[in-house]
Amino acid sequence: SHAGQPAFPGGKIDPEDYALSRQQGVPVGRIAALREAVEETGLDPAGVEILGELPTLPLAVSDFRVTPVLGWWASPTRVGVVDTNESALIARVPVRDLLNPANRHTAYVKRGRITHKTPAFEVVHSGSDARVEFTVWGFTAIVLDKIFDALTWTVPWDASVLKPAPASV
């Protein structure tokens, strides 16, 4: 668990995901990713087109290995917090805001004698209930950074700007 950190929906592969994967001829990671998105946001999976998977990445703090599954939300539907034990906010952030160099810096957190640094994105969510400003950092920011680099969308930003990672959202 990475409480307080902005993150994409996700979690472990459940045993029933394997059966669905075999039935549908779809990779198990994709089945699990859609199931988690439904469980955590109420997303209608029929409106999502799976584009592919990124290479598996280590999650250093918890020693998990994560395979990000990328999807295009082709037919957006209403989403929201389904379980407050899992999520506090479902935020929709425009990609242009994530790419804006003014919204980027390097976040760091010290654990003992080790300092961990990750890319970070300052973002604003303006929902029907409130305007919320927060920092996307850690694993989620690393994934976003890798996606933008792979797509050659990254706009040069000053990675030497260091800010402490927030304690929570």
Region locations from a protein language model:
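Unchanged
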Residues: I13-V136, D145-K146, A150-V169
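N-terminal strand-loop-strand
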Residues: S1-A19
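A conserved hydrophobic position in a structured secondary element of the catalytic/binding core
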Residues: F8, V93, F139
